[in-house]
Amino acid sequence: KDAGEGIFTGLFSLVQVFVTMNPDETVYFANPGPDGKFNMDYYFHLADFNNEPINDWKDIASTLLSIPMAHQLIGFYTVADNADGVLKVMRSYQYYAANAISDVVSKNKWDVGNQRGGYIWHTTGSGKTMTSFKSAQLIANSKDADKVVFLTDRIELGTQSLKEYRS
């Protein structure tokens, strides 16, 4: 209703991630952009590391809305999708996975033994391309690796990823 009335222009156009709560449920989603087309497929429930939903407002305030997590979510765990012209935000399990992958790379002692790299193997499921892309981006930006290769198993997926995540 509010989007149709143009409420997401002006000040609200600067908000990157919205969090909405009622007594029973909390969802977060990226700003849908100037056209205000909200897609419920991109409304996510916050979950803990074990993917158990978090809905209590006190837990939401101490996790999702806390600093540094709110800053990390907006700064590191969103992707500007050039193909659609929208901002995408990661689901909780994607956030935890990308963060854990980046942590393993940063904490590993690469100069000990015969380690020269590694790989991440994803199985079929929702969000693996964004998770692997963000993991690669976090590792590359942290300078914890000399080179990061983003390899896909299909030409179409590589092309799609390049178009979506080029920014």
What residue ranges belong to the model's regions?
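ATP-dependent helicase/translocase motor core
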Residues: 1-147, 156-167
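Conserved residues at beta->alpha junctions
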Residues: 152
